[in-house]
């Protein structure tokens, strides 16, 4: 017999439909959600203002569960990575990132959590550890939400900024992602504003078209990493199915009617995509999309051949983009000393389990 559905995976619409079918009012739905999300109870018995019959109904049809964090890795810059085990034993990663101090020295209250959307990844970007073991499965809505709840419990603080930049391609798990977004943004859920949520895609065009029709103003980051088909074909297999000639129009469609700038994520890899010519191609795309650029010097993955460019080369690339009046930042990945780049911690753990740790 399959386990009962998670109460934390129910959108307000779905829970309302269930309770209405069983003769309960919208008010009762609101009460239940208040207990789940405002008071953070973990049993139905704790919902003291509900009638016993309703508590029994909930207990017979739903359950509470948060995934287990099996490893926590701290970092000198206070970033922490969590390795989280799902009920079937699958491992995923999340990273909690406190904001840096503001320029005026005041403490920022932003707490960002990077979450995963799949166990592994099918897209096989050549520089990324997540795809080395392939795709195992999609995460459920409850497992996506569970990462947030587990991280908050360990950190002792509420997350107020979420980036879907962990393991997996979020837009290929769109239905579960959409339900998770409803719970995250809902006034009767986690209540995190849509503009404090970023979805990253490697260029999965069918999912981008669905996201374009999605009503909430979720931010978008595109893992571009190459500004020509020649470069993207070399390091991102997704480009062979959805090349730039399809990706860029899909991004324009997403941006139509929105007052938002997409972010072009661009990992700088030595002798692959870090030349002045590459910078010129990137500028051309950024101007067409009215996008900002986030440059990330490559975070070395054991067993892969790619190298990080020199700091001088990285700065030169950034300056070329900046001179073209494109908003650009250079992000050195926090947590470089804790395997914090996408997929590295899970890869190491799986290799240890199979006795195939790379040397």
Swiss-Prot record:
Its EC number is 2.1.1.192. [4Fe-4S] cluster binds at residues 121, 125, 128. One of its GO terms (biological process) is tRNA methylation. Residues 107-337 form the Radical SAM core domain. S-adenosyl-L-methionine binds at residues 168-169, 200, 223-225, 299. It is found in: Cytoplasm. It comes from the Bacteria. Pfam families: Radical_SAM (PF04055), RlmN_N (PF21016). This is Probable dual-specificity RNA methyltransferase RlmN. It comes from Akkermansia muciniphila (strain ATCC BAA-835 / DSM 22959 / JCM 33894 / BCRC 81048 / CCUG 64013 / CIP 107961 / Muc).
């Amino acid at each position: 017999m399959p386990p009962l559905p998670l109460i934390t995976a129910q959108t307000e619409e779905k829970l309302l439909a269930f309770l209405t079918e069983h003769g309960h009012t919208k008010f009762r739905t609101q009460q239940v959600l208040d207990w789940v999300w405002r008071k953070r109870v973990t049993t139905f018995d704790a919902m003291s203002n509900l009638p016993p019959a309703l508590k029994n109904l909930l207990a017979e049809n739903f359950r509470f569960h948060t995934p287990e964090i099996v490893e926590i890795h701290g970092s000198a810059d206070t970033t922490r990575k969590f390795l989280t085990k799902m009920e079937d034993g699958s491992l995923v990663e999340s990273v909690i990132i406190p904001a840096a101090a503001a320029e005026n020295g005041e403490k920022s209250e932003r707490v960002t959590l990077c979450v995963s959307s799949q166990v592994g990844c099918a897209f096989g970007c050549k520089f990324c550890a997540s795809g080395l073991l392939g795709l195992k499965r999609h995460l459920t809505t409850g497992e996506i939400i569970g990462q947030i709840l587990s991280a908050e419990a360990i950190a002792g603080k509420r997350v107020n900024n979420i980036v879907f930049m962990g393991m997996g391609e979020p837009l290929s798990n769109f239905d579960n992602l959409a339900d998770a977004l409803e719970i995250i943004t809902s006034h009767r859920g986690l209540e995190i504003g849509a503009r404090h949520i970023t979805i990253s895609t490697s260029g999965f065009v069918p999912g981008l078209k669905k996201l374009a029709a999605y009503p909430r103003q979720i931010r978008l980051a595109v893992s571009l990493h190459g500004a020509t088909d020649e470069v993207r074909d070399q390091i991102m297999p997704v480009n062979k199915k959805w090349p730039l000639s399809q990706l860029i129009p899909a991004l324009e469609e997403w941006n139509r009617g929105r007052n938002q700038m997409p972010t072009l994520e661009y990992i700088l890899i030595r002798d692959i995509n870090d030349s002045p010519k590459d910078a010129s191609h990137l500028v051309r795309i950024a101007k067409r999309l009215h996008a900002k650029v986030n440059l990330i010097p490559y975070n070395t993955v054991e067993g892969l051949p790619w190298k990080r460019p020199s700091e001088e080369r990285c700065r030169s690339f950034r300056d070329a983009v900046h001179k073209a009046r494109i908003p650009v930042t250079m992000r050195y990945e926090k947590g470089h000393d804790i395997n914090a780049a996408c997929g590295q911690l899970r890869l190491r753990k799986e290799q240890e389990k199979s006795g195939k740790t790379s040397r």
